[in-house]
């Protein structure tokens, strides 16, 4: 596993080694190893899966990866929780992955927005951002009370999750219920217009426009 992880830990996006692992059909074996290996090896496997699933996710989904990742999202290890959320983020970038993430892990991701570790928060917010692209994902996130947790991350100037949280809230504002709740909180987004990051400032501008949109 350490050799595989080194093979995929390249600065390329996606790493060249990830494609070779996919072609070799090793994804089901790596997923199976998550059940039995030590925490240290699990961290390596999750890092490898993250790189591989950036390329293609169908084999992992067929191997019931979501069930195992759900367990890892509540693991005592901060690194394992963060890496598991990152794998879910990569799965959510694929059309076939969004539905699975919506159906199975949104409540867990919402709870991780309050994790004590900033990396876990950032990975969870990123995964939610992709999961809420689908209407069903937005409804499930609203039902899981995602808005107050996301707003808290937006209000934290140094939060690593700030950009993903703003984008996720923009998705939730596409739903009438979400827009109503967020209309009372536009000041939080106004503060982001002074953020040093251009991406954050631009995302905040879009969020404010969507929240304040009114039908003719």
Which positions does each model-derived feature cover?
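Alpha-helical adaptor scaffolds
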Residues: 133-136, 148
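Extended amphipathic alpha-helical scaffolding regions
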Residues: 49, 66-69
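Buried hydrophobic core positions in alpha-solenoid tandem helical repeats
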Residues: 29-31, 68-70, 108-110, 149-151, ...
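Recurring C-terminal helix/loop segment of individual leucine-rich repeat
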Residues: 16-19, 58, 96-99, 139
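Alpha-helical solenoid repeats of the armadillo/HEAT superfamily
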Residues: 1-9, 20-23, 37-51, 74-92, ...
């Amino acid at each position: 596993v350490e050799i595989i992880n080194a093979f995929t830990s390249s600065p390329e996006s996606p790493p060249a080694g990830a494609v070779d692992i996919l072609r070799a059909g090793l994804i089901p074996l790596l997923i199976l190893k998550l059940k039995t290996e030590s925490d240290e090896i699990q961290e390596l496997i999750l890092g490898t899966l993250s790189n591989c699933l950036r390329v293609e996710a169908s084999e992992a989904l067929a191997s019931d990866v979501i069930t195992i990742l759900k367990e890892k999202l509540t693991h005592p290890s901060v690194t394992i929780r963060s890496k598991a959320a990152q794998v879910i983020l990569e799965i959510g970038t694929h059309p076939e992955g969004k539905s699975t993430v919506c159906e199975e892990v949104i409540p867990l991701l919402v709870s991780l927005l309050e994790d004590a570790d900033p990396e876990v928060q950032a990975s969870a917010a990123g995964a939610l951002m992709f999961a809420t692209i689908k209407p069903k994902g937005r409804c499930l996130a609203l039902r899981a009370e995602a808005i107050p947790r996301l707003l808290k991350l937006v209000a934290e100037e140094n939060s690593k999750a700030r950009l993903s949280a703003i984008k996720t809230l923009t998705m939730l504002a596409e739903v009438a219920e979400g827009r109503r709740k967020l209309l009372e909180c536009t000041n939080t987004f106004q503060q982001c217009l002074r953020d040093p990051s251009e991406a954050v400032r631009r995302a905040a501008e879009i969020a404010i426009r969507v929240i304040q949109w009114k039908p003719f």
